[in-house]
Amino acid sequence: MLKKKNQFDYLNLSHVLSKKKNSGGGWINKISDKLSEINVAEYQVVSKHSNYLFYSRFGLLDTFVYFLFFLCFFLNNVLFLAGVFHTKQFTFNEVNGFNQFYLFWTVEKPTDIIQASITYQISQYGIANLVFGLISLALLVFLSFRWTVSLFFKSQTTKWERIGYTTGFFISIVVYLLWILLMVLFLVLLDQQFFERDTQKIQSATRFSLFFNVENNNGVYLSKLNSFGVFATAWAISLVFYSFFFIAIFAFNYNKTKLKQLFKKSKAK
């Protein structure tokens, strides 16, 4: 049950909403009215059910988006790490070995190894990795928007909890946006500056892509992460662990009332 102060806020919001519906206005006012309707509906549900997240269509939407974000967030980073650690050694005289060297790109080996250039194209694996990242970023922005406008969330948290969660959300958006930009650069930018296409230069150069160096051992080429690749890999690993932090936040808020009751009982004893 909400506190009296929060009930007053919602009832006052309902009173304002009844005035706004006949006020007309442009699309901004219509959006504002719709958001007010959602907030009033949230109050009507939470006043009857303590488990708002599973009894309200708005709560179900928030819960669904939350776990969909976690899934896409997790898969994006796991796919990247799997692709990074999947690299194998290859030689230029193999028929198919060179094509399987990276999961992120489809590599067309030229017939004339000495004179021709290698063609790179992002693979379905690389596209899937990028799509999961873009979807999770969009979902994170949506969750941050819901956190900002929802009076239900504001009523269920203290001032310092709201400050902490809001700060965490926006920091997460910035960090994850930088990560997605890095993925776009890594997967999509098939520029000569980053990806060596001339086979003669590959045999003497060490940098094969943005994240990898290639060592030549008597015609056998072995890929290793360069310093930038190590940094990106460490970043991805930290994001995998960070994704579980969102599950912890959800579990804490879902059980916060019960946890407070247990804490009070243990303190009373």
Swiss-Prot record:
UniProt keyword Cytoplasm present: no
Membrane-spanning residues: 64-84, 125-145, 169-189, 230-250
The keyword Cell membrane appears for this protein: yes
Gene Ontology cellular component annotations, sorted alphabetically: plasma membrane
UniProt keyword terms in alphabetical order: Cell membrane, Membrane, Transmembrane, Transmembrane helix
Main location: membrane
Cysteines paired by S-S bonds: none
Record's subcellular location: Cell membrane
Its membrane topology: Multi-pass membrane protein
Name under which the protein is recorded: Uncharacterized protein MG323.1
Organism lineage: Bacteria, Bacillati, Mycoplasmatota, Mycoplasmoidales, Mycoplasmoidaceae
